[in-house]
Amino acid sequence: MPQADGQHSEIGGGKPAAAPRPSNVPLTTAAARGGSATVAAGGLDAAYNYGPTVMIDGGRTRMWWCSQYGSAPPPGDDILYAEAPTLDGPFTGPGGGVPRAVLSGSGDGHFDGRHTCDPSVIRVGATYYLYYTGAAEDHAFGNSIGVATSPDGLTWTRANGGRPIVEPAHDVHRDNVYGAGQPSAVYLDGWFYLMFTDTTGRATTPNGAGQFVLRSRDPVFGGGVESLGKHGFEAVPATNSPRTSSVIEAFSADLMWVEALDAFVIADETKTGTRISFFDRSFTTHPYQPIVVGGPWQEGPGLARRPDGHAPLSAVDPCGQVPFDVVRATVIGAATAPTDLRHYGLDVKGVNACPDPARTLAVLDGLAAPSPTRTMDLLTGGKLIRVDRRSVAVALSGQVLDQRPPQFDKLPVAATIASAGPAVQAKDRGVAFVLDGKLWPVDSPAAPVLNGSVAQTISPAQWDAYPTGSSLVR
């Protein structure tokens, strides 16, 4: 299917911020890295590789991208999956070997019958969500956006009854007949944010460039949808309502929330590399000046993100610097389509992300690190939890550091997850650790197993009678 920029033949409500807000502040960058080698490529007969989405998930780096396998019917774009210990790869299929095709066209009669491409993957609780571009054939305005769900990021089930969740608005028809696609998703404060291309949007440029943002508390955007307009987010009746405001002039961009900077970032490609642009929560102001991750490119970047689409923390100084890493296609291959996925990155330094206790708790939320007693400490929901087993801390955290941040030393330990400690489960309630007589719900079924805990089955009434601690839901 055609790419949004027309260059190649294949497709490639939050809480208010504290005042005063920074405005166009220059950032200091250092530690430019990457680009020395191709880190991922499809095996078999894959002739192109581009449009990655990159997730730092526990102790591994996971990546999904657009390619094509002849062995994955029907003929057309497929979404591949591979993983590696770090961003520098090499990325392989689960257990080694070639990357796996995990989502392909659904066949005749469906909006994504032939092509699935441009993945954006996030995890909320125990569910992975894959937002993607789908097309039935290579025809004008044929691209729309779908979503699939998975318990593991490997086996996917199409949501919304297999129907698209975002279709072209058809506000205006230009020479660029791509339609709607190239989604990027983030989960923040209970909202699913979805940024995407729509070449039929009213606010696009003459060549169809532009990025639009919707948000909803429903992952399939079936209701309660808000669209980013000129004055912030406003309720709209449908996901194809007129596109009145584009947040940036770009194709194939990626979105991320950076808690350390209290800002959204959008990554898109410019002449010198990947431009990182900064926006406040309402996308109405620019708190910081753009930075550029330099180097060659041929298609849009995939930012390295945590499972919820947030920026990873620095392993060296989580309150003082922020890593920005991308994977992007760098050459046009034999199939005249982008390939050679390589990693590039840099750090923003001199950040004052933890000026007070409240900001410290927000920035470091979801982080696990070694404790002074040879166990692990997990910061979640404003509470520091001591965890006997590292594997359990990994399962419950958004990110694990090998070096303990000094800010942890100022926090009291609220509870301890002891090895083989008590856990309970109840119908329609889930699973929880019992810590000091209180329920601490978890969304990782593996966590009690990894802890050696046998979850006792109780009734919903018994569950509801327990006093509650904080949620350990990621």
Regions found by a protein language model. Give the residues of each.
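Beta-rich carbohydrate-recognition and catalytic domains
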Residues: M1-Y50, M55-D112, R123-N176, Y187-V247, ...
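Glycine-centered flexibility motif
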Residues: G35, G146, G179-G181, G302, ...
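Residues that act as N-cap/strand-start positions at coil-to-secondary-structure junctions
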Residues: A46-Y48, H115, G179, E249-F251, ...
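Conserved beta-strand position repeated once per blade in WD40 beta-propeller domains
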Residues: G51-T53, D118-S120, Q182-S184, S252-L255, ...
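Generic recognition of flexible, low-complexity loop/linker segments
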Residues: Q182, S252-D254, P312-L313, L364-G366
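Surface-exposed interaction/gating patches
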Residues: V247-I266, L367, P372-T375, K427-G430
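Short, surface-exposed polybasic-aromatic patches that bind anionic ligands, especially phosphate groups
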Residues: C354-R474
